[in-house]
């Protein structure tokens, strides 16, 4: 779960 959340944030950056 956490990994997916961080992945989404990284995509935005």
Swiss-Prot record:
One of its GO terms (cellular component) is extracellular region. GO terms for biological process: defense response to bacterium; innate immune response. The keyword Secreted applies. The modification Leucine amide is found at residue 13. Keywords: Amidation, Amphibian defense peptide, Antibiotic, Antimicrobial, Immunity, Innate immunity, Secreted. It is found in: Secreted. It comes from the Eukaryota. Its main location: secreted. Expressed by the skin glands. Transmembrane segments: none annotated. Antimicrobial peptide. Belongs to the frog skin active peptide (FSAP) family. Temporin subfamily. This is Temporin-1Tt.
């Amino acid at each position: 779960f956490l990994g997916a959340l961080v992945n989404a944030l990284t995509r935005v950056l």
